[in-house]
Amino acid sequence: MIGRLYMKKLKNLFLFLSSLCPVFPWISQISLVMPFGLYYGFLTALPIGPSQILSIRTFFLEGNRSGIICILGSMMGQFVILLSIYCSPLYVMLVKPHLMTLLVIPYMFYYWYRTKNPSRYYILHPIKSLTHAHTRNLLLDSFIFQLLNPILLPNPVLTRLLNLFLFRYSSNVFFLTSSLLGWLCGHILFINSIKLLLFRIEHDSPIIYILMKRSISRTFSILISITFFLYLGRSPVPLITKKFADEITLSDQKIKENLWEESLWLYRPWPTSFFDQYRWNRPIRYIPNSKSSHNGFVKKQVSKFFYDECITDGKNAISFASQPSLSIFKKQLMNYLHNSDISISTKDSYKGWIETKREKRDALNNEFKDRIQFVYNSSTIEEAMENKTGFSHDRNHFLVKVNDPFLSGSSRIRIPNKKYSSSLLKLHDSKDQTMKISKKTKRKHTRNKMRNWIFNKHKKWQHNKFPLPWEPIPTKAEKVFWRILNESENPIILEMLTTLNSIKEKNYQFRITWEHIFQLPRIEKAIFLFRSKQEIEDSIFRYPSHLSLKNLTLFNIFTRSKNIFYSAKIAVSPILQIEEMQKELPRYNSRLRSDRIDAVNVDVDIRQRKIKNLGPRKGKLEDKEKEKEKAAQTQTEVKKEREKEKEERVIKRFQNQSDFRRKLVKGSIRARRRKTGIWRLYQSGTHSPFFLRMKEIPISFQSSINALRLNKMKDERAILGIGKELRPFNLYKKRSKADRLTIAARFDFPIAHAGRGVLLIIQSNIRKYVILPILIICKNIGRIMLFQSPEWKEDWAEWNQEIHIKCTYDGIEVSHRHLPAHWFKEGLQIKILYPFHLKPWHIHRTNNINDLRNEAQIQKEISDFGKQRKLSFSYLTIWGYQTSSVFGSMKKRPSFWRPIANALKKKLQRNLFSKLTWISHFFYEIILLSRTFIISKKPNNIPEMSIQSNELRYDVSDYELIQKYPNSNEKNDYVVMNEISIESNNRNGKEISHESQDQYKDNFNNIRSFNDIETLLTDISGTSVEESYRDRIETYLRLNKKNHRYAINIRLIWNKQLVQTQQEFSRFRRIIMQFMHKGYRLAKRFLTKFYREIFRRFTFSIQLSIQLVLRLTKNITKLSEKNKVYQNLNLLKKNEQNLKIDSSRNKPVLSQAYVFQKLWHARTRTKIDVHYLVQSLEREIVNSIENNELKASKLKDLKWNEHNYLNDHIKDLLEIQGLLKETQTFTEKNWKEWLHCFTRYQISSKIEYGIVPQKWKNEVKKRWKSNTNKLDKNKEYKTLEKENKYSLYETNNMLKQRINNRNNYCEFYNLLYSFIDSTKASNIIKLPIQQKGKEDPIQYINDINKIHENIHLNSKKKYKRPQFQSISTEKGDIDSNLMLWLLPNLLDTKPESVTNSLDSYSFEMYLSQNEDKDSLKKEIRFNAKKLNLDTKEPTSDAMKPTSDTKELISDTNEPTSDIKSDDQSENQNKPLKEKSIRERKHHRPIPQVKWKSKSVEKKMQRINNLTSFLSVIEDRKNMENYIISFCMKMGIDIDLLNSFFTNTEDELSIQLLDDSAHRLPRLLNDQTLVRKMVSILLNFEKQFEEGITSKISSQSISSIYRTEKKYSVNSYNLEDIMLSRRYRELRILNSLILEKQYVNFDHWIDKSEKYPFLNLPSQVQIIKRFLWPTYRLEDLACMNRFWFNTNNGSRFAMLKLRMYCPD
């Protein structure tokens, strides 16, 4: 609401300012432009990109000065980008960065490496000087970051809008100043906001800010690198995309693969060797209209034109390239102005602009009139034409038009040097130049005999190189020729084959000549040349055997580089030759292989749904592992294993994620999408996350209170213990499993799989082959140093037992040798079986087992050890750790040092502490005696004791055990008792019986609850205290003696161990001394050898240098002597060259290269064979009918009628141009007559007089008698010269001149894409002006001139041309029947009936098929009608709607009846061709649906959540329980869920969805476009071939002719008078004027003059006006390059279109 109010206020402000325009004129210019400039300039600083992040980082780390420098660098980068709009080279360098694309990623790595560890100096002491190197680096970094923004990173929309407005309003000073002001204000606001943020961080941070800077720098370096990689992921570089192989091959030949094709990529020019311009980078996603459509994924022709009214030449017209947004804005503006009270007069606001444009237009019109009037004042058109200035070397040598910057202008481009073969490179000059050269050679022929001899030798050399047309071809080439004729199916070639076979049967010595090869069509001719030159290529590749890539060593490259490059050029040139001679057609036209269903392992060209590998079947994998664990396998077992491997199948499934690359062509980058998210199962529209927050429903205050109450109730229940029983037992396990699944889903995308898989493989190899071997070696070396036996065998055995098994991403095992398929995209896991753990020592188990241990317990321990051994595995992580499951928690590693520490503790306890126990024993005995003495004083209280000698075995060791286990419970009693028994057994040296052991157990059970000796003695019952006291004393004395002996033994053992350690230490010292002595000797010996080798090499190098110096001096002296000799030779050669003739001036008059190029384009048929075209169409439709197996009875109803196929206007045009006539071929007679046209093959009069003098005299007399009167009138003679033709489009027909000028490719390219302009050619025939020139009648002298007369008479008989009627000036409009000749009634009807006329004249073909097959071979003739050019009859019979057109009009006006007719047609089984045409005429709606209600949408959202939960669960067995529990908790409608499984798809769509389909505008009929394209090429060929025949006949005249004062009429273009740029400006000014004022040229043309026939220049004029019409995309000329890529079918066709042919 706030935004709407703001926009309303802004609109009112604009309207108020516009109302003040009459009062203040300057407000009219500022009112609309200034706010837009401020707004868009201010918004350029808001988008946050890498350059802004860099500036924020410098503010935080280095202070205000460095931050401002960084922002200045980014501003400089923005300013350079804005300047690129006005500077084209700068724009090309920034937008087409082939080199910068390769340098961006290394630069980013360099920047990241440089800033990851900042120095403390910059943090603690910010730099204050501007001349420091760090400031320059900072400025350069920010500048480069800003330049990279429009290249690789997605440029913000706001910045692009500013660029667009700057380009549009570049001439408006107010907009430029306001945008600059807004731009500066935005940056100032940005700087102040950063300073405010810095102030808050410094004052609010709990840590000292200087210490905090290091973490800030680390964070920003990571952030910048992440943003770069994210942007690169969204807009990837097209270097790594999949490339399609070029499948353009000839019709009947598969070209042999070139072995050097891959190795010769270095010889191709930059950047085609690294970039492929034909790759599909951003194709359009194909959406079929219906399920039953079988069209290809790439349409042949796509119409994206938007038709709207426009003003052209001061009148309304229909434009096909108008902007939809402009028309919508126009309607809204008109509605607003109509409803508003303020009346804005456009005439007043645009009055000044209109006046200036009108004055300019009038000036151009007046200049145009003056030039035309000058032509009518008996002047030639050459004098009236506007000239251009160009460069020249001297008076006679001019620059080529393409290379001249003055003449080519903006169309001048850099032309690469193409590689031609020798036969095409050495073409001769034009005929004018050859005539001049021949004259010069004739003059010099008699002067110098030496030059004459050189000329004859040169002539023989050319004869050997260029054979004549009647000479036979080689035998190998003849075999190729016959093979091509036998393989081809072209009817022209079949006729040619029959004629040649008949000639060969009559004459056995018949040979194929070059004349027969020139009669072949273009494709077959190219095949012949390619196959004949293929033998040369093979010989080139076979001859230099040393040129293979394996044998190309460094020495060969430098020594034989000339041969290599020469053979490489020869290998490349023939391939490029064929490509240049033939036009490449657009590729990928419905040739893509696709599958309607997403299937597994299908080779298609369209991307399908992503598939994920789950791995092979488990049962077969286990069998395979068991077989691999066997040590020895026989050959039969190996065969069985291989068979099982073949039988294994990989389980695959589709991924659950959405795939936006689906249904796109492979090798293409996915389309750019905005930042939209998909969060529902069925979502009709996407929304940006920024605007998605507006749709969030705010939580009310009452709902929050209820939530707090619920939480409080839960806490109370938890305190009371309610609900504890409802908690599941394995809650922790489920949560951990859910966590693992979420982590796996988070990393389940191709980029993460690629990086993670590579790291896992690296970690696996490092662990297996680097870390573990190093640990094993270090451990055993340590054991050797500690004088222990090494354990190499045990450690390497355990290391070999560790197996790394490669698994899929889900954890399914595949193999320990091979990686799973598509692991780089689908993920990888590595499972470690029997992981190796380094142990300090290995326990060697003996066979002696203690008898006291139970056998069952031993077996249990062994089985437990086996189970533990069998289940020992873990999963490897990218950091090298081990986990118990996939993405589980880390597994604890067993410590290496803990067993060593425990062993040291035990050893200390056993050896040191046990040996020092005699001290404790002594104090213990003292305490015992003292206590017994105290007890003896109380005899009355203690009963007597009767203790046997064998019962009281209480020893010091027993007391130690009690002290060792003072608080032992019942579980440890048995262990303690066992230790007591074992120690007593060792002490006495005898085995203890089971009875004594039981007694000890009973006694210990009685005394274990007492804490001291007092309690122990009070429980003993005996007879008397005295006996007990006596026995105690005896035992004490006996034990005291033993302890004394034991202490002496301890001392001796201790001394003995000390002596042993000293001996071992001395032995170690002796070994070290020996090693040092030997090492000293070895080092001394090595140093002496080293010094000797250095001395020897140094002396040898000195000797070599001396020898080289001596040799150089000798060579220098020899070179000086040879130089003098060469100077003398050069003087001799210069003198010889003065005597020779220049080879360029001594070329013959007619070379074979000219004949070759002339006949290459001289087709076998001089006219277009319409009969053959119609017959081919007829055959195609008949074949389609036969494939559908229609009955012959139904075919009889379909009748072929020529009126149904072609319109009257088309037939008239075809009859005028002679297209309905039969084709003609060159005969031997024609060749002989043609050869007489050239002076080289013409016999001189002297020789002819000497051979047949009488015949020659008779012929000369006849000619002189017939021309005596004419000779008396005019006695002026002229030599034979070429006629001057002043039309710029009437260029020389010699194709060798076009090849020399390198324009052949460009002109054919323009012809193919200029058919779009033809829809605007409303006036074609009546525009040419008539020029009265003097006609020069030819006075024939020679006999050969009869040929010209016969040809002239035959051409008059064949082409009956209608009389040309002059254009009247009574009406302002100019009528024409050729205008829009495919849609002739478009401009004569009203605007309301335009659509009906378009439909009424759409082509429908009704072909018939008779039962007899001979009827297909009949010729289809058209009844030609005369052209009705009278302006008083605007309508004719041809323009009246027939019955068929009425039906079509009724069909378009009644869509319901059309649907019925479609149903009836299906029932009646009409042909498929008619059905497809009817479907194209009636466009179908696009299927689109929406939910019926919001409740249904909520239910489906719940089902969506259910599916997302179920997709994570792996337990498929208990899936039903999960579904029921989720449905109960989430409130899902079970009936609706069941309907997905019970109902069909149509029933669900009726139940849940509503239809919201809408129709699109009608597509442009592709048949009209195809026909126009074909007609353009055919008309051009016809004009070209007729031009050849006329010029050949005119050049055959070798006599002198005389002129008479007689006027003839030739038609020229109006545009030829003025330059193309000025005439284009005139057209644009006429279209921009809003009033209906246009230039009427009718009164400039003489209406009284009529013409007897339509001559050849007028036919050329029709073709020229059809190919280059007068309306030449004026609306596109006014627009900028930002709009060029909108309204075209192939996205780049408009950019390739040349609006004007090169001048």
Curated annotation (Swiss-Prot):
Q: What is a biological process (GO) this protein takes part in?
A: protein transport
Keywords attached to this entry: Chloroplast, Coiled coil, Membrane, Plastid, Plastid inner membrane, Protein transport, Transmembrane, Transmembrane helix, Transport
Keyword DNA repair set for record = no
Q: Which residues form a coiled coil?
A: 618-660
- Note one Pfam family from the annotation: Ycf1
Q: Which domain of life is it from?
A: Eukaryota
- Could you tell me what this protein does? Involved in protein precursor import into chloroplasts. May be part of an intermediate translocation complex acting as a protein-conducting channel at the inner envelope.
Name this protein carries in UniProt: Protein TIC 214
Q: Which organism is it from?
A: Psilotum nudum
